[in-house]
Amino acid sequence: MRLSLSAWRPPDWLVYGAIVAAALAGSLSRRERAMAPEPPPPVPGAAGMPISPDSPLAASPITSVTPAAARGAQTGFSVGEAGVWMTAAAGLGRCRTPGVVAAEGRAAPAVRRPGADAVLVVTTPGAGAPGVPLAAMHDLQAGELGFVPGFPKGGPGEVAARLLGPQTRRVLARFEANEPVLAWAEIGHTEGLKGARPGLVGAPVLDRAGRAVGVLLGESPRRGRIYTTTPDGLRRALAAAGVTPGAAGAGQPIGTDNYGRAADGLRRDLRVVQVVCLRAG
């Protein structure tokens, strides 16, 4: 259901920020490029192996993922070992039972939490991975770096970007969000990653300290833009869901020279995962 935006009017600083962002975007697109190497290949035979007892999701019931569900997979991430996960709400709007993928073709059923707007919070009670730490609530500055690890086309990949600034009401309506949406200019991605990347939706945007500062809501490949929530939006989503994520894992410093390796580690530890719909509502 599309949310009404009539009660929210963009303040002057947002309008001016959009103008500054456009100028910054043009400047960035002309001079910066930071590519990441291709991720390591999958381990042969891993698809049919049992879930390891050391897996963060080993204590959860596991169900098979149908090919149709796998094709619709998006990215999500852990925010605490208590089994609390975040992703984008749009792709799972009519999903009754989401699933957190534990291994290829297998997922742990998750419980939807109430209060979702642009961000969806789900839980896997009794099983969870070390959380991605959340950045403190603060205003990001134009030009800051962000790194997006995930599963762009059903497989591993990542994007690097620089923050442009808050977007206008028209962009808010596109994402059915009633809070600010941030735009970032892409400056790099995994080698060989081309075209639209629907599977990256729901991924965390990480700052240079490895802390989540937003959730990826969508992209504009032709313009080289990605769109995310704000840091405040993450904590509001948790509060609306009525969950306490528990202790998060340590953040890892990330830069343009190592964001590919950092993303590989987050995926390997199931701190960044695929999220699928196991049963439609």
Regions found by a protein language model. Name each.
Residues 9-12, 29-55, 212-281:
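C-terminal cap/linker of serine protease catalytic domains
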Residues 1-6:
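N-terminal Lys/Arg-rich, disordered targeting/topogenic segments
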Residues 12-27:
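Hydrophobic membrane-insertion alpha-helices, especially the h-region
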Residues 60-89, 105-109, 202, 260-262, ...:
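A conserved glycine-rich beta-strand in the N-terminal activation segment of trypsin-fold
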Residues 85-88, 142-152, 201-222, 270-276:
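Active-site-proximal beta-strands of protease catalytic cores
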Residues 56-68, 120-131, 157-245:
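Active-site region of chymotrypsin-like
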Residues 82-158, 195-196, 244-253, 258:
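Conserved active-site neighborhood of the chymotrypsin/trypsin-like protease fold
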Residues 82, 89-90, 95-96, 150, ...:
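Sec/Tat-exported extracytoplasmic proteins
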